[in-house]
Amino acid sequence: MSEMRTHFPDRPQFSGFMKPCRVEGDISQLEVYGEIPKEIDGVFYRVMPDPQLPPFIENDPWFNGDGNVTAFRIQDGRASFRQRYVRTEKFMRERKAQRALLGKYRNKFTDAVEFRVRSTANTNVVFFNGQLLALKEDSPPYAMDPITLETKGLYDFEGQLPALTFTAHPKFDPVTGEMVCFGYEARGDGTPDVCYYRVSPTGQFKEVVWLVAPVVAMIHDFAVTDNWVVFPIIPQVCDIERMKQGGEHWQWSPETPLYLGVIPRRGAKGEDVKWFQYKNSFPGHTANAYEDKEGHLVIDLGLSEKNVFFWWPDAQGNAPEPSSIHSQLVRFTLNPHAEDLALPEPKILHQGNSEFYRIDDRFATHSYRHCYFDLMDPQLGTDFERIRPNLGGGYPLYNSLAHFDNATGQTEVYFPGNTHLVQEPVFIPRKDSTTEGDGWVLALVNNYATMASELHLLDTRDFTHAQAKILLPIRLRHGLHGSWVDGRDIGSQTEQLQ
């Protein structure tokens, strides 16, 4: 039986800016400094892990919290806020019990009760076929109303979902509207099975392919081109026997290479997959992928030589010092028909310590020019001595937003202030413009001086300055991922968000 706690553990991931928010509500007419262009009309959705109750696991990681979804409605130069928890099975049962019931991260053997679905729905939120989908890669999505943020329930695509898991990073084809997805550990914890599937814009499954990974390990993100799908395997491995003994789901494996699984996007069979190999390293989020003129695959992603998830060390307990971890935007180029599966050294696109890469999604799966991401550059002037007491811990620190131009190799940097750190950006296309990268970048910013959150809006034509700063009267915990949805895609009911 789990211990009932009356307060959150005295740990960095539950203190300072990371102290759980536990807030639901609406705020209209947020304060705006500067000017929001009236042509911007849509909703910025994002989700943060935000435990409603103290966990009974003392050192619970920050991203094991309940999914709390935020909707920022922007229209007519104004901004409003709405936030609701995803009513998962976990959330509802713990609310009724008035105590935590979920045990260690992705370890059902440590739970206080048996769950049908353990999802926290806390990693990403995307809009598809009229529904908002709250995603966690160990389970099916939860569907939410995009206006009210009311939870509709667990969503299996009307009984079509073939796997027990669904990626938190589905890819959308900007030409066909197709959603390309997969699930790993797709037959349950500790299984090597990967299930790949394509979904039509109206929600019909068009193809299902089962394949077997060379190791039971994490596949957090993936990449899609016109004709191929790529699965980067992170060398964090699962051992079901370790889990049964109360251990962690994941353990860093220095002996395991980075695998890139490559399979045809259409008409594939499981045995068609090729597992290309690179030295032991940590592949992060993908920026984009496409096919060059020779038919080679070009895959741009974050890469670190060290274990980015340092809180899950190797079998001997070895883990890197967090401040020593450096992730760079790199480019792998490979021939999908090659017999030699050894990957060449990737090209470093940007030397800086970066992550959370976003592009103009209208150019996804195709050759592209512009990439936007979080960057940590200590030389910019962040006052770490001042903000350190309020930082909390357990989450990645980035102090600026960057725009990298693939054509010129040049980088522009926006520095939000010496007491600020940034979260993942999203790109907003300029209305009626078809030019790649013509629009705005929007990101949530942590202000450690005021202990409140802000939205910073940058015009890509003047990237180094904020066109508008939208201030919240509350603090939002560091989140994971989100998306921008055009108001025309949601419909006229979006005025209810104002």
Curated annotation (Swiss-Prot):
One Gene Ontology molecular-function label: metal ion binding
Cofactor note: Binds 1 Fe(2+) ion per subunit.
Keywords assigned by UniProt, alphabetized: Dioxygenase, Iron, Metal-binding, Oxidoreductase
GO terms of biological process kind: carotene catabolic process
Any matching Pfam family: RPE65
Binding site for trans-resveratrol: Y105, K136, E355
Catalytic reaction list: trans-resveratrol + O2 = 3,5-dihydroxybenzaldehyde + 4-hydroxybenzaldehyde; piceatannol + O2 = 3,5-dihydroxybenzaldehyde + 3,4-dihydroxybenzaldehyde
Major enzyme class: oxidoreductase
Residues reported to bind Fe cation: H169, H220, H285, H481
InterPro entries on file: Carotenoid_Oase
Signal peptide interval: none
Source species, domain of life: Eukaryota
Binding-site positions, piceatannol: Y105, K136, E355
Cofactor: Fe(2+)
Entry EC no(s): 1.13.11.-
Function (record text): Dioxygenase that cleaves the interphenyl C-alpha-C-beta double bond of resveratrol to yield 3,5-dihydroxybenzaldehyde and 4-hydroxybenzaldehyde. Also cleaves piceatannol, a compound that differs from resveratrol only in the occurrence of an additional hydroxyl group, which leads to the production of 3,4-dihydroxybenzaldehyde and 3,5-hydroxybenzaldehyde.
Family: Belongs to the carotenoid oxygenase family.
Protein name, per record: Resveratrol cleavage oxygenase 1
Species of origin: Aspergillus fumigatus (strain ATCC MYA-4609 / CBS 101355 / FGSC A1100 / Af293)
Lineage, uppermost ranks: Eukaryota, Fungi, Dikarya, Ascomycota, Pezizomycotina
